[in-house]
Amino acid sequence: MRLVEIGRFGAPYALKGGLRFRGEPVVLHLERVYVEGHGWRAIEDLYRVGEELVVHLAGVTDRTLAEALVGLRVYAEVADLPPLEEGRYYYFALIGLPVYVEGRQVGEVVDILDAGAQDVLIIRGVGERLRDRAERLVPLQAPYVRVEEGSIHVDPIPGLFD
């Protein structure tokens, strides 16, 4: 079993145990989640209130019980995640992938930054020199970035990986 973080619980919603959910909308497709420190909980109800998602979990029946979960991390089992359409990726699947420029490995994805308008790959370089091992930021949606099976390929960008 492999768990991946999909969000956190925000403030309680109303009086019957609802919790605001801050995170990936993939939660809309799940029947259960793993709650940090509390184990697996079935999702009994899930709905939108404006732009927010509200989750009701099994065993969380009032506001007091919901308050105990505020701020906790929420996880899903990778096998429970729905498949994505072509060209879309779960972030966790990109972390650790090698990055190549013209067939030469220049680094590895160590994190992904949500920069608002687009997501940015944080790539830690590989090489002998300290400069080679520096972290570089590359927009994931840029036309010069291609995600392929098991690797990421970046067209040459003058000065970035020289």
Swiss-Prot record:
Domain of life per record: Bacteria
Domain PRC barrel: start-end pairs: 86-160
Xref: InterPro entries: PRC-brl_dom, PRC_barrel-like_sf, RimM, RimM_N, RimM_N_sf, Transl_B-barrel_sf
GO molecular function terms attached to this record: ribosome binding
A GO-annotated cellular component: ribosome
Record keywords: Chaperone, Cytoplasm, Ribosome biogenesis, rRNA processing
GO biological process, one term: rRNA processing
Location in or out of the cell: Cytoplasm
Similarity annotation: Belongs to the RimM family.
Role description: An accessory protein needed during the final step in the assembly of 30S ribosomal subunit, possibly for assembly of the head region. Essential for efficient processing of 16S rRNA. May be needed both before and after RbfA during the maturation of 16S rRNA. It has affinity for free ribosomal 30S subunits but not for 70S ribosomes.
UniProt domain comment: The isolated N-terminus (residues 1-80) forms a closed, 6-stranded beta barrel; it probably has the same form in full-length protein. The PRC barrel domain binds ribosomal protein uS19.
Summary of subunit composition and partner proteins: Binds ribosomal protein uS19.
Protein name in the entry: Ribosome maturation factor RimM
Species of origin: Thermus thermophilus (strain ATCC 27634 / DSM 579 / HB8)
